[in-house]
């Protein structure tokens, strides 16, 4: 399952900057309206199914990849990917009055973190900070700054 930009804070920050992004890349409206909102709704559905399984006593393992654009050095980007994953875990912990928190604490919900940094980024994205269009504001650059839920596994014991 591919889900990017899933936290309300990211949505809010991107939507607040939509006008700035559109100055550089005027065709981003579809991304803001369809992709961001659609992926957030997918995430809520996934959370609903996960919560139902956890409440039935099932144990789950969630595999989450973190990515970054190539704008900074490799080590920085790996750490940035880790922070993105941690932001997701923090959001999960606080979701709907901390519904997932007891399952995270008890180990019934385990998060497997897979930080990739810039290693999977497309060559279309510039690593030159002076090339703001291709390093920050292009759709390709935006899509590099993400996390992906790649698997939700039911753990049999």
PLM-predicted stretches and their roles:
Residues 2-4, 9, 15-23, 41, ...:
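Periplasmic OmpA/Pal-like peptidoglycan-binding modules at the C-termini of bacterial envelope proteins
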Residues 1, 64-69:
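Short loop/turn segments at strand-loop or loop-helix junctions that form parts
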Residues 27, 34-49, 75, 79, ...:
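Extracytoplasmic/secreted proteins, especially bacterial periplasmic and envelope-associated proteins
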Residues 70-74:
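Short, solvent-exposed loop/turn segments at secondary-structure junctions
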């Amino acid at each position: 399952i591919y889900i990017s930009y899933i936290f309300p804070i990211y949505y809010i920050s991107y939507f607040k900057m939509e006008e700035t992004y559109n100055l550089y890349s005027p065709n981003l409206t579809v991304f803001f309206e369809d992709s961001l909102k659609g992926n957030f709704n997918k995430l809520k559905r996934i959370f609903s199914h996960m919560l139902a399984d956890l409440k039935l006593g099932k144990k789950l393992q969630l595999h989450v990849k973190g990515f970054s654009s190539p704008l900074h050095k490799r080590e920085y980007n790996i750490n940035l990917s880790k922070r993105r994953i941690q932001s997701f875990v923090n959001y999960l912990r606080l979701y709907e009055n901390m519904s997932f928190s007891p399952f995270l604490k008890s180990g019934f919900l385990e998060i497997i973190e897979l930080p990739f940094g810039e290693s999977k980024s497309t060559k279309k994205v510039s690593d030159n900070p002076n090339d703001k269009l291709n390093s920050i504001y292009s759709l390709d650059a935006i899509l590099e700054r993400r996390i992906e839920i790649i698997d939700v596994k039911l753990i049999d014991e």
